[in-house]
């Protein structure tokens, strides 16, 4: 009878070799950790919030205010949220507000509403909130119209479609009135893939020989966020887009705003990434527009090699002067 032998397994997962050559070791596992040389299952996950955030989340930042309130900044492919406790609050910045130019059109038997608003620049999946609209005459009431909608189809540069919660009838022949306010959030980004680029990009025969391919398609870039707290406030940026600022003192009912809209602001209008230097409190923008172009005049053209930073202790003062520390 063969004697029993105690098996001694080496801790850790090794996949640099085959499972055969990794004798006495572990080659494959899932949700396992090693403690004191022995394997054990990793504990489960607890649901952070029962509320749903729209889009694929790609950026999280946790910080506390001066009063001890804990916040989480969450950037997704469709929205930007501030999570207070366990409740996400939509603070997605606004890019355009129109007043008195939007109109609605309904078709009997359809829940699709056609919105005409000149030069709205919406992408498929963008979000717009209406107010001030009146009933179309039937079941498409003011209550139905005056809320947030996701764009379901873009007809052209002036017209797009949304889906109402009810089906229109023959009485819905109005246009919503002359006092409609349409508030457009910043354009969404992709959540999974990006378009191909490089050789062969674009349509066949476009442009002149050896000219650069134009692969900039609205909404066709992966939505990536960068964010950092400036004290108790939050600075955040869409890659290849504007820099935004959220003031914690105004609460989660207020949206983030373009940092260039703040008083006495000379910040970049476009950047690929932002962060705050923790020790000396400069806001730093990577891949932004330079302060001046080659002609010596102010420019808004992005340069991926340019790095700029605000004056110390200021998120808005970016102008290089002898009396500050911006650069």
Question: Where are the regions that the model predicts?
Answer:
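Hydrophobic or amphipathic alpha-helical targeting/insertion segments
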Residues: 90, 232-246, 251-254
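An acidic- and aromatic-residue-enriched active-site/binding cleft used to recognize and process polar
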Residues: 76-77, 85-86, 133, 154, ...
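N-terminal beta-propeller domains
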Residues: 1-97, 186-214, 270-327
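Short consensus segments that form the blades of beta-propeller domains
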Residues: 51, 71, 138-143, 225-226, ...
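Small/polar beta-strand repeat architecture
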Residues: 90-224, 250-257, 263-266
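A fold-level detector for beta-propeller and closely related beta-sheet-rich head/sensor domains
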Residues: 73-75, 215, 237-241, 260-263
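Active-site-adjacent structural elements in enzyme catalytic domains
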Residues: 229-230, 239, 250-251, 263-287
